[in-house]
């Protein structure tokens, strides 16, 4: 049996009742988080452009777009919602691989579940299974695939969307293998587009293409036996430097990678989160202001420089991928939320001047969420701190209360207080709902 066929067998065999309670709870946490960041992004210019395009397509109204409430086809809804979910880079992260599993999977699940009338519990289970597949695909090619320049959220994410949709549709193992082929050949996304509007198209297309692949396989589309492990398959072509086959199918259904997933406290690239923790801690402990600081030195994992070395960002999205801006904004504002990543903040004279004083030194022995921050003051004295695990990491997770605070801040800025609270209540109760419409109706500006 090929790697793809084995995976298809695992997906088909899992029953919702076999999922641990904590997995269902974590699935709800990811939905709280992803709807919060999506609703917060609804008025962004690229979202408006994408929504206008979706409206012009004139598709049969079967699924709901977050925010605007546009009703369109499931694949188009998945595309727009997948884009919104990742635009602000405020979605969750699978720490072993830096995959963002929710943005490509939940939009596909919500659109399909709404269309076919799936129960809330089945939607949660489908998400968990899809996220698991995306994480396992990622682990099977990490770090070689990412190092080659691929954006793992787009490439691995499509497999997760396929798996989730296939499970909801109750496809056979043969159909699932075919769907993985249809979706897998569309695995795409290059890291060159980081810091631009285009980056969020990766999970958007993954969600839409994955859902489409499942529907086509249901209709009889076929593919090769092993799109993942074949001679010219995913591993061979998109991860030529290496792969780990055991990471894909080992202990499937017994071990859940949602345990290694983290929710973001800051609205920027996750590898900068530990340095923001450190800078904010020192700022608050020593009442630091920008005019006192001669330099900020960050001792960090190599990935920080590889992904976030933009000393002079020009616009908001570039600021999200500038460790210099993240550190400077953290010291000036004591935060790293949406307000710290606007065009105005990126061009703010105080923050710009402080960015020029931020440097990094690679510590190859450090983990990806580990840093030491040293701040030198104008009088020559220094203050420093060590962060072993960033806030939001699996070792230092965001609590439900902290998640609700993040949710309320983001959604409350767009919806009324009553509407905000009603949606939150609906998400937490989704596992008892007959369908997902209690959520999809409330995730729009008009509400129920």
Regions found by a protein language model. Give the residues of each.
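Terminal-appendage/accessory-domain detector
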Residues: 1-98, 191, 195-208, 212-448
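Amphipathic, well-ordered alpha-helical segments in soluble domains
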Residues: 3, 7, 104, 126-129, ...
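Function-dense linear segments that define catalytic or interfacial modules
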Residues: 79-94, 101-119, 133
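Glycine/serine-rich anion-binding loops at beta->alpha junctions
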Residues: 96-103, 151, 155
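Contiguous domain-boundary segments centered on the initiation and propagation of an alpha-helix
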Residues: 99-103, 118-121, 125-128, 339-344
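Short amphipathic alpha-helical face segments that pack within enzyme cores
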Residues: 103-111, 156, 160-164, 274-277, ...
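Glycine-rich, mobile lid/loop segments that gate access to catalytic sites or pores
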Residues: 113-212, 224-231
């Amino acid at each position: 049996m090929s790697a793809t066929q084995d995976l298809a067998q695992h997906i088909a065999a899992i029953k919702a009742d076999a999922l641990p309670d904590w997995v269902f709870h974590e699935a709800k946490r990811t939905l709280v988080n992803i709807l919060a960041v999506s609703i917060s992004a609804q008025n962004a210019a690229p979202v408006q452009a994408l929504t206008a395009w979706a409206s012009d397509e004139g598709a049969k109204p079967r699924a709901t777009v977050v925010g605007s409430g546009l009703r369109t086809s499931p694949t188009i809804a998945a595309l727009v919602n997948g884009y919104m979910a990742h635009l602000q880079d405020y979605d969750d992260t699978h720490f072993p691989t830096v995959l963002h599993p929710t943005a490509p999977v939940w939009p596909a699940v919500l659109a399909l579940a709404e269309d076919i009338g799936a129960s809330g519990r089945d939607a949660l289970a489908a998400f968990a299974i899809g996220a698991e597949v995306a994480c396992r695909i990622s682990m099977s090619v990490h770090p070689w695939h990412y190092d080659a320049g691929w954006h793992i959220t787009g490439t691995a994410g499509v497999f997760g969307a396929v798996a989730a949709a296939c499970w909801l549709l109750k496809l056979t193992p043969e159909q699932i293998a075919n769907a993985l082929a249809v979706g897998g050949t569309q695995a795409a996304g290059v890291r060159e587009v980081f810091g631009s509007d285009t980056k969020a198209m990766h999970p958007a297309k993954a969600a839409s293409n994955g859902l489409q692949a499942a529907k086509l396989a249901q209709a009889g589309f076929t593919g090769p036996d092993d799109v993942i492990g074949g001679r010219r398959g995913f591993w061979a072509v998109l991860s030529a430097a290496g792969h780990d086959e055991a990471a894909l199918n080992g202990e499937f259904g017994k071990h859940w990678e949602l345990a290694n997933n983290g929710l973001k406290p800051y609205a920027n690239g996750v590898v900068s989160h530990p340095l923001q923790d450190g800078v904010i801690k020192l700022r608050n402990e020593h009442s630091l202001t920008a005019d006192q600081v001669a330099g900020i030195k960050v001792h960090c994992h190599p990935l920080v420089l590889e992904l976030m070395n933009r000393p002079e960002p020009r616009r908001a999205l570039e600021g999200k991928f500038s460790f210099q801006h993240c550190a400077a904004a953290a010291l000036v504002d004591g935060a790293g939320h949406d307000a710290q990543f606007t065009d105005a903040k990126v061009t703010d004279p105080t923050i710009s001047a402080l960015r020029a004083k931020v440097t990094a030194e690679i510590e190859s022995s450090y983990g990806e969420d580990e840093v030491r921050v040293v701040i030198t003051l104008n009088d020559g004295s220094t203050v420093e701190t060590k962060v072993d695990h960033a806030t939001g990491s699996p070792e230092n997770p965001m609590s439900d209360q902290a998640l609700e605070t993040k949710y309320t801040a983001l959604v409350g800025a767009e919806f009324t207080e009553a509407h905000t609270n009603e949606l939150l209540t609906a998400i937490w109760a989704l596992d008892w709902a007959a369908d997902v419409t209690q959520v999809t109706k409330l995730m729009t500006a008009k509400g129920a």
